[in-house]
Amino acid sequence: KPLQRDKTLYKFLWVQSGTLAIEVDHIPMKLAKDEIVTLTPLHHLTIKEVAGEFLTFVFNSNFYCIYGHDNEVSCNGFLFNGTSNVMQLKLSESQVASLRDITDSLTSEYAIKDNLQEEMLRILLKRFIILCTRIAREKFSVSPEREKAFDMVRQFYVLVDNHFKEKKMVQDYANMLHRSPKTL
């Protein structure tokens, strides 16, 4: 339940075995073994049915997003704001092995209590995000032309996130992006 209540967390849900039925923004989704979804704090998540095991990987913007990451692997990057739909990834066996190495390292790092732990956790998180970004780019066959379209979607979501209280019209965001409202 805390996973569903905390509105500040970025989330990875990774089905380890069986299936997981969820609702994201009132849209039902069923995830199978070795599938991952990425969610932002703006997504409303409801876990409907757990028929197996899943790993939840969560972090808040104070831990990761405030650092100077480039657009591709930031909280405003491809995984979290690259499309208008929820990012759902099907992992190959080799991708599962690579991501499992990182999650195993994270588990080990949690046991080490020293002044370097936070930075090491941040590095491992970035590695996890980079690998998932590569998997997503491969899935969506991101070419240089398509990259521009994804960048536009990313920029739009960042603007909405930052200005939604005072800006209500598509025209407002189109002006900030120097675009016609019809192109958004």
Give, region by region, the residue ranges found by the protein language model.
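Short, Lys/Arg-enriched, Trp-marked, Pro/Gly-tolerant hinge/linker segments that flank
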Residues: 90-93, 113-120, 132-158, 162-177
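Amphipathic, well-ordered alpha-helical segments in soluble domains
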Residues: 11-14, 98-102, 124, 128-131
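Short beta-strand His + acidic residue motifs that chelate non-heme Fe in jelly-roll/DSBH
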Residues: 21-23, 39, 44-50
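A hydrophobic/aromatic-rich effector-binding and dimerization subdomain
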Residues: 48-108
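Generic protein-terminus/edge-of-domain signal
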Residues: 1-30
